[in-house]
Amino acid sequence: MLRTHYSNEITEELNGKRVKVAGWVQEVKDLGGIKFIWIRDREGIVQVTAPKKKVSQEIFKLIPKLNSEDVIVVEGIVNFTPKAKLGFEVIPEKLEVISRAKTPLPLDPTGKVKAELDTRLDNRFMDLRNPKVMAIFKIRSSVFRAVREFFYSEGFIEIHTPKIIATATEGGTELFPLKYFERDAFLAQSPQLYKQMMMATGLDKVFEIAPIFRAEEHNTTRHLNEAWSIDAEMAFIENEGEVMDLLERLISYVINYVREHNEKELKTLEFELNEPKRPFPRITYDKALEILSDLGKEIPWGEDIDTEGEKLLGKYMAENEGADLYFIYRYPSEAKPFYIMKYDEKPEVCRAFDLEYRGVEISSGGQREHRHDVLLEQIKEKGLNPKSFEFYLKAFEYGMPPHGGFGLGAERLIMRMLDIGNIREVILFPRDRRRLVP
């Protein structure tokens, strides 16, 4: 390897020892008889100090010729001293320029000079050199790691379902069509049907982390056309409350994992991530509409709570319940997909829920309808063709246990967890209504 240590691995035990550090030139300072280079790697900064009397003439003459964002390797001796900004410095014995950076740069990777989001996304490779941007994606990595750890600890099995499908998961037209040889196909908008089919296999508890594709023409700060979904399904449940319990445990685990493992990144972002208040409050859809009505926002029964309503409710729950996270459940059946189980005693209401995080929906779930005859009727009620779902319905004819699950938007979770205003900032190369490159 061209380096022996990252910046954060240089400790006092290495004082007087030889190391090789590598990264991007963040800054060069020439004070005449002494020159400085600050090298940035993914873990932080290394100060290279070059006194004229202690380094070769070749190195001394090369340093002023370095440009910002040149990639260099420095081999030298570690010196811990209070005079150094970071508490230590490296006195260079060798300096090699690996790659030169063009000038001017497309944006300032230190973030001191602000750039428009579009400029940043067009130059994402350089945008991530900004420590604050990199911190977001280190936290994103931790989120996915924590999700897997949680599900494995709960006895779940990871599955992988197809992303090229023949029919819509939930009906509707929000699908990206493609040619599959001589046939028409679509990109999957959800693994819903497949994870339910897994409940007939005996696997009982499954999860998947995978991309989903939705051809929605939204151009908002919280919508993407390609996003990552965290999906779970479990069998032999008694009601949707058990699914909400599972989701609450997952969210709490993830947030606490980030609090524990990403202190440095949270500090870089200057953000305090609080432990979630548990249990998450649970309010019915009817209660949510009542609260909104008291706040002057009227929503007809049966309609989804719109963006304005979600924000008002989020503010209300924070101020009155001290809760950032809360469930809304017992939705009107007409507002939810065909596979959600209705209450037998009140079929206009179903066993669905949404999880809201400070006024933004991050997850939807519920108990599914496992009775073949009832499910078939619900497909027809939604105006869908049962023949399009024969492969799915077949799994319900040979012994299907009661089951439920949820889909959780990874980007929305991260966006709300870190209080970031635009969802495009938490995915490397966003795909939205207007962006297909890079």
Curated annotation (Swiss-Prot):
It comes from the Archaea. Its main location: cytoplasm. Its cofactor is Mg(2+). One of its GO terms (biological process) is aspartyl-tRNA aminoacylation. Keywords: Aminoacyl-tRNA synthetase, ATP-binding, Cytoplasm, Ligase, Magnesium, Metal-binding, Nucleotide-binding, Protein biosynthesis. Its EC number is 6.1.1.12. Binds 3 Mg(2+) cations per subunit. The strongest magnesium site (Mg1) is bound to the beta- and gamma-phosphates of ATP and four water molecules complete its coordination sphere. Catalyzes the attachment of L-aspartate to tRNA(Asp) in a two-step reaction: L-aspartate is first activated by ATP to form Asp-AMP and then transferred to the acceptor end of tRNA(Asp). Belongs to the class-II aminoacyl-tRNA synthetase family. Type 2 subfamily. This is Aspartate--tRNA(Asp) ligase.
